[in-house]
Amino acid sequence: MHDSDTDLIYSQAHNQVKNFTFDAQVVEVFPDMISRSVPGYKTIIDTIGRLSERFTQDDSNIYDLGCSLGAATLAMRKGITANNCKIIGVDNSIDMVKRCKMHVDAFKGDTPVTIIEGNIQDIDIENASMVVLNFTLQFIEKSQRQALLSKIAQGLKPGGLLVLSEKISSDDNVIDDVLINLHHNFKRDNGYSELEVAQKRSALEKVMLTDSLDVHKERLTQAGFQHVSLWFQCFNFTSLIAIK
């Protein structure tokens, strides 16, 4: 018998694979899905917490845009040493928001947290010392990504930090194929079947549109960030830091 939180969404053949959405079904299995699908996820979350120790400033806001179940939010709240900060988590899935609030409320912390249901493109970024986009930008229309990053840069205080984690594609088709196959093997090693890998890929192909690392770096520079660097990569999963 499987635990209720095991990801079995694509374990049976679907007559028609629907576009992936962060609905109630996904929310139930999200931690399992992420840990078995995203290499290095725990390292990224832990490092976001470490970065919050260094970059959060007194009397400022911290944003977790596309907060899902609040893993990055909780890591930052644990790491923050600055005074009088506030964390604002935003997600457009009502199911995620409901569960995220429960997760956040289950852990005590000195820094107040507000979780909002909303479109991150409509949220004002103000007086921010740290912003996190953890595998979120890839679900935004490509034509709207530059505007979002520019808005974040404008809302950050000098010395403020953006953490941008993204699945990437490579302009080199040979490298792209190698990285994709390594990732699929990672999922197989974590118990996903060929059917699950294929159906999940089909569900994501129209809603998760990846960019190359160079495109991400160019956008961040154009947005106004002075210092941009890749700090993590495993296969085609990456995380960058951008400092204003």
Curated annotation (Swiss-Prot):
Recorded GO MF terms: carboxyl- or carbamoyltransferase activity; S-adenosyl-L-methionine binding
EC id: 2.1.3.-
Entry-linked InterPro entries: CmoA, Methyltransf_25, SAM-dependent_MTases_sf
Sequence positions that bind S-adenosyl-L-methionine: Y41, G66, C67, S68, D91, N92, N134, R201
Catalytic activity: prephenate + S-adenosyl-L-methionine = carboxy-S-adenosyl-L-methionine + 3-phenylpyruvate + H2O
Keywords: S-adenosyl-L-methionine, Transferase
Entry's Gene Ontology BP terms: tRNA wobble uridine modification
Family note: Belongs to the class I-like SAM-binding methyltransferase superfamily. Cx-SAM synthase family.
Name of this chain's protein: Carboxy-S-adenosyl-L-methionine synthase
Designated gene of the protein: cmoA
